[in-house]
Regions:
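A short gly/proline-enriched turn/hairpin at secondary-structure junctions
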Residues: 21, 35, 40-51, 61-68
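Hydrophobic pocket/interface hotspot
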Residues: 20, 32-33, 40, 52, ...
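Short, solvent-exposed loop/turn segments at secondary-structure boundaries
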Residues: 45-47, 98-102
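Short beta-strand segments enriched in hydrophobic/aromatic residues
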Residues: 36-37, 91-93, 127-128
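Short, low-complexity N-terminal intrinsically disordered segments enriched in polar/charged residues
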Residues: 1-39
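Surface-exposed, charged secondary-structure patches
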Residues: 41, 55-99
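Short beta-strand edge/turn micro-motifs at domain boundaries
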Residues: 106-130
């Protein structure tokens, strides 16, 4: 497989983040889960690890049911080494409380990508804080 430069991966990660946000904001858990490697793990802030595509899809479905909206990933940095790449940045989203007031929240984000056999990239580990 051909080597990839950090600049090239930055473009890939920026595009993937925009498409991930679009799938999230459309409340499509199957489309969000499609961004993950078959053995991927989510490490949600303050919660247990979520491993495997079916569990990841259920996690996002449950989150959508809680009314989380307007997700956005802002990339700060990428690094790459052979078949793994790391994207560091910030995330933000919002939800409405019982009174209907919009509550914004966000935090730091770290995504580890694994290069796939077809040359594409999928998320292997996804961790965030609040």
């Amino acid at each position: 497989m051909q080597a990839i430069t950090p600049e090239a991966f930055r473009t890939i990660a920026k595009d993937a983040s925009a498409r991930w946000d679009a799938a999230f904001n459309a409340k499509q858990p199957d489309q969000v889960a499609a961004f993950y490697d078959a053995s991927a793990t989510l490490l949600p802030a303050g919660s247990a690890a979520v491993t495997g595509l079916a569990a990841i899809e259920r996690f996002w479905q449950d989150l959508f049911a809680q009314g989380v909206v307007d997700h956005r990933i802002d990339m700060d940095e990428v690094t790459i080494d052979a078949g793994l790449a790391v994207q560091r940045g910030k995330w933000s989203a919002a939800a409405h409380d019982a009174a209907g007031t919009r509550q914004a929240f966000g935090g730091n984000l770290l995504l580890v990508y694994r290069r796939q056999a077809d040359g594409g990239w999928k998320i292997l580990n996804h961790i965030w804080n609040l």
